[in-house]
């Protein structure tokens, strides 16, 4: 064989190898471009976080939203459930639809919520503790209303001889709220008021003595006739009459001091064995019996007489015009 021909053939093979090596970078670039295009196509099918969550029936769109769908039983169709902001919301929607369609055979993405077990345990704990709390509450309850006061002997220890309570007695406290309104009394009524205070203190002292001796079984030492009896209707009429007439002695401090001194002197001078003589309350006050309204009083209005009444009303007809008489 000719050595020149063999050498020429060897050079030709080397040239072919060089051309192949020069063509290899192009093939590598084509493979790289094909792989990158395939990756782009894969990314377009789902969102970037689609591989992180593996929930049944849940997938992510390329723009980031999550969608949920469920396959209906015994069918190949899927039921659309909606678009959600997070994967957990889409998974919950799938679980609700699965329970509705499959019942107890549903395969859920999320386990049953633990708050239900927590609530059941808390309810059991509360049920266990409720008897103790109810017993403690019944033990701590107290009556809202006060207990009634014990009844006293005779049933009249809280009231005076004329139904006036001792704890609010205007005669003993020296108050003038009932006898004297905002305008007060005239001096004459002030004197009458002093006499009424004296009489009320005397009656109260007699009643207390009577009640104390009744409790000690010594009622024989006191005569019931020592307590002067006045008409309650006349008493209230006197009070109302004093309020209507009015005066300027309600706020007089000196008159109040006189009342207090008079009350002390009368209270110290009175005793059980030597009661003072009976005094007519109406005459001692200087009041006209015509002003009193009671069982034995027949006159109410203080007129001078029937002649004055008839004369005053009879004079009305003297002023009637005789011309008007024709129309009657």
Swiss-Prot record:
'Salobreno' means 'salty land' in Spanish. Plants lacking ABI4 are salt tolerant. GO terms for molecular function: DNA binding; DNA-binding transcription factor activity; sequence-specific DNA binding; transcription cis-regulatory region binding. It comes from Arabidopsis thaliana. This is Ethylene-responsive transcription factor ABI4. It comes from the Eukaryota. A motif (Nuclear localization signal) lies at residues 41-48. GO terms for biological process: abscisic acid-activated signaling pathway; defense response; ethylene-activated signaling pathway; lateral root development; mitochondria-nucleus signaling pathway; positive regulation of DNA-templated transcription; regulation of L-ascorbic acid biosynthetic process; regulation of protein localization. Keywords: Abscisic acid signaling pathway, DNA-binding, Ethylene signaling pathway, Nucleus, Plant defense, Repressor, Stress response, Transcription, Transcription regulation. In seeds, mostly in embryo, and seedlings, especially in vascular tissues. Confined to the hypocotyl, cotyledons, the root cap, and the root quiescent center. Residues 1-56, 111-141 are annotated as: Disordered. Induction: Only in young seedlings by ABA, imbibition, glucose, 2-deoxy-glucose (2DG), trehalose, and osmotic stress. The lineage of its organism: Eukaryota, Viridiplantae, Streptophyta, Embryophyta, Tracheophyta. The gene is ABI4. Residues 27-37, 113-138 have a biased composition (Low complexity). GO terms for cellular component: nucleus. InterPro entries: AP2/ERF_dom (IPR001471), AP2/ERF_dom_sf (IPR036955), DNA-bd_dom_sf (IPR016177). Interacts with SPK1, SCAR2 and SCAR3. Binds to MED18 to regulate abscisic acid responses; recruits MED18 to ABI5 promoter in the presence of abscisic acid (ABA). Transcription regulator that probably binds to the GCC-box pathogenesis-related promoter element. Also binds to the S-box (5'-CACTTCCA-3') photosynthesis-associated nuclear genes-related (PhANGs-related) promoter element, and thus acts as a transcription inhibitor. Involved in the regulation of gene expression by stress factors and by components of stress signal transduction pathways. May have a function in the deetiolation process. Belongs to the AP2/ERF transcription factor family. ERF subfamily. PROSITE patterns: AP2_ERF. It is found in: Nucleus. Residues 54-111 bind DNA. Residues 16-26 have a biased composition (Polar residues). PANTHER family: DEHYDRATION-RESPONSIVE ELEMENT-BINDING PROTEIN 2C, ETHYLENE-RESPONSIVE TRANSCRIPTION FACTOR ABI4.
């Amino acid at each position: 064989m000719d050595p020149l021909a063999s050498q020429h053939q060897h050079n030709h093979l080397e040239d072919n190898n060089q051309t192949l090596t020069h063509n290899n970078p192009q093939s590598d670039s084509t493979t790289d471009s094909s792989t990158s295009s395939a990756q782009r196509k894969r990314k377009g099918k789902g969102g970037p976080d689609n591989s992180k969550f593996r929930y049944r029936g849940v997938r992510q769109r390329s723009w980031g939203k999550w969608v949920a769908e469920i396959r209906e039983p015994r069918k190949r169709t899927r039921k659309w459930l909606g678009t959600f902001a997070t994967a957990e919301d889409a998974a919950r929607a799938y679980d609700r639809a699965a329970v509705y369609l499959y019942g107890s055979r549903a395969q859920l993405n999320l386990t049953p919520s633990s708050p239900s077990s927590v609530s059941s345990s808390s309810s059991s704990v509360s049920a266990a503790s409720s008897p103790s709390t109810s017993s403690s509450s019944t033990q701590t309850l107290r009556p809202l209303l006060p207990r009634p006061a014990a009844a006293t002997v005779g049933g009249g220890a809280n009231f005076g001889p004329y139904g006036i309570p001792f704890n609010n007695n205007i005669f003993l406290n020296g108050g003038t709220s009932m006898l004297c309104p905002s305008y007060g009394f005239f001096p004459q009524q002030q004197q009458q008021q002093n006499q009424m205070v004296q009489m009320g203190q005397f009656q109260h002292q007699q009643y207390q003595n009577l009640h104390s001796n009744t409790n000690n079984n010594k009622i024989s030492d006191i005569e019931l006739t020592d307590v002067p009896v006045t008409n309650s209707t006349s008493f209230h009429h006197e009070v109302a009459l004093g309020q209507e007439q009015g005066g300027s002695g309600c706020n007089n401090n000196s008159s109040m001091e006189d009342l207090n001194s008079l009350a002390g002197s009368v209270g110290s001078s009175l005793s059980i064995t030597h009661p003072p003589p009976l005094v007519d309350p109406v005459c001692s006050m200087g009041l006209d019996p015509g002003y009193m309204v009671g069982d034995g009083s027949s006159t109410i209005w203080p007129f001078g007489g029937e002649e004055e009444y008839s004369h005053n009303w009879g004079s009305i007809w003297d002023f009637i015009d005789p011309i008007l008489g024709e129309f009657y």
